[in-house]
Swiss-Prot record:
SUPFAM superfamilies: beta-beta-alpha zinc fingers, KRAB domain (Kruppel-associated box). This is Zinc finger protein CKR1. InterPro entries: KRAB, KRAB_dom_sf, Znf_C2H2_sf, Znf_C2H2_type. It comes from the Eukaryota. GO terms for biological process: regulation of transcription by RNA polymerase II. The lineage of its organism: Eukaryota, Metazoa, Chordata, Craniata, Vertebrata. Its main location: nucleus. Residues 41-50, 98-112 have a biased composition (Basic and acidic residues). One of its GO terms (molecular function) is zinc ion binding. Keywords: DNA-binding, Metal-binding, Nucleus, Repeat, Zinc, Zinc-finger. The keyword DNA repair does not apply. GO terms for cellular component: nucleus. It is found in: Nucleus. It comes from Gallus gallus. Belongs to the krueppel C2H2-type zinc-finger protein family.
Amino acid sequence: MEPYVLLDPRQKALYRDVMQESYETLMSIAQGLVNHKAAEEDAVGLKEDAVGSEEPQTHPPHNPAQNRTAGSHRRKAKRPDKAAPLGVAQTPPAAPTPKRDGVKPSRVRDRPFGCPDCGKSFPWASHLERHRRVHTGERPYSCPECGESYSQSSHLVQHRRTHGGDRPHKCQHCGKPFAGAAQLLAHSRGHAADRPHRCGDCGKGFVWASHLERHRRVHTGEKPYECPECGEAFSQGSHLTKHRRSHARSGRTAAPLRKCFGQSSDLVQHRSRAGKKPQRCAECGKAFRAAPPLRRHRRERSHRCGDCGKGFAWASHLQRHRRVHTGERPFPCGLCGERFSQKAHLLQHGKTHRPERPYKCGDCGKRFENAPPFLAHRRGHAALKSFTCGDCGKGFAWASHLQRHRRVHTGEKPYECPECGEAFSQGSHLTKHRRSHGPKAPLLPVQGRGEAGEPLRASPLSSGAEQRDGRRAQRGGVEEEVGWGANRAVLRGRSAHSWPRSHLPMLGC
């Protein structure tokens, strides 16, 4: 049942049709064997009657009612069956099965309507017509709202529930409604407490072994999916598929992706849609192969914030964003009373009240619920802190962190709000402050003047390689690589200590 649950509604309906046809075929073959055996027994009985008629003295008199019944059976046997339609497979008529010992014959219809493509036969012409759509790819039932078409009316009825909000199947755990029972069953497995496949590194549980195998690559770093064009490797096949689209967009020729299908109807549908983009946006002219991507495109950024102009695809996202401007925090913590603007933040905060924190730091005693933040915290203790503050002796692993810390002692605040003039020591503080003013102002370049009067400017990085390779700093007379952010912080620090205040940059967020 597990592979059946993973199918989409259209594939499930096709699977049910094929299984029903197979069942009817087996029943028809079995009934044919029964009818053939009954016909042989009738032939033997007629011969015995003929032999008995030669000796009238010893044979008992016949019942007229039985004679009429037997005659009617013989007349029915001599009557030819109705002719099957032209071009349809003909099956020989089955011999009549008379009542024997009070047992009624089984009513199994003949299957005169055969498919010329695969040879399957059906008792009704309508069944054959519906089956033929598997080979032709015909989809006569179209949705009037989104234009998606289906081969059977039942599939269209199932699809239209998604538009009308008719979702009768509701999850008992979270209350989420679903249009079909199969979707509810697949969703309910996510709530199942039985997660037998557990990761040995972080303890996370999974319902399926394949999900655990995919998760294990996070710890092992395995990347089995390699791009044939540039050699870049990925841990998941879907990531490789998305990456290869970038080659097609940039003009580089990529090897064609071979797509496989489990049903011939899916292949027919794929061939009919390949290379065609009949759905076109009336506003920008962008074309799409199907209606659902066009609907998603129309929804993109349709809900805009009146304060900052930022667009959102959903009204709920806009409502959540509006709390940044209004300061609303409707989600309070029931234990400590702290309030949050988003429910996800409240759930994250609630974990701090739980005692289940198995990962404990041996240096500072801090506890963590999950392994990734614990490992990141441990790296902070293990890192070489060679950048030491001359005032308080505190060490830092990066020069940028030291430069930021130095502002605590110097009182330097290089980030100034262009609207009200308030200054801040960190750019993140300026970002939070500017939200209170409404729309964001454009970013201004980081610049100043050096000792010789030449302008200094933080040059933009052109690639990640330059970001990694072009970073140098002086550490104890030896050149060593540090983050580009450290270089920028050094420049910013020199400008703060050596240059007048009027030359300090006005930074935006």
